[in-house]
Amino acid sequence: MAVPKKRTSKSKKNMRKANWKNQAKLAAKKALSLGKSVETQRSHSFVHPRYEEEEEED
């Protein structure tokens, strides 16, 4: 089994962890923004049926 030769420093570990957390924070922000735009029917990134059209079909 492969074993690292030296211990990873705290600063390097903290930088990697901070990078990972920032990526997760950005993904959550984008998901929330997309959810809000879909909720307010202002989304242009994908096609979805309008609520008015669904009500007319019933």
Curated annotation (Swiss-Prot):
Keywords: Ribonucleoprotein, Ribosomal protein
Cellular component terms (Gene Ontology): large ribosomal subunit
Skewed-composition ranges (Low complexity): 20-32
Renumbered residue ranges of the record's region Disordered: 1-58
Pfam families linked to this entry: Ribosomal_L32p
Biological process per Gene Ontology, one example term: translation
GO molecular function: structural constituent of ribosome
Comp. bias (Basic residues): 1-19
Family: Belongs to the bacterial ribosomal protein bL32 family.
NCBIfam families: rpmF_bact
PANTHER family, sorted: 50S RIBOSOMAL PROTEIN L32, CHLOROPLASTIC, LARGE RIBOSOMAL SUBUNIT PROTEIN BL32C
Record-given protein name: Large ribosomal subunit protein bL32
Gene: rpmF
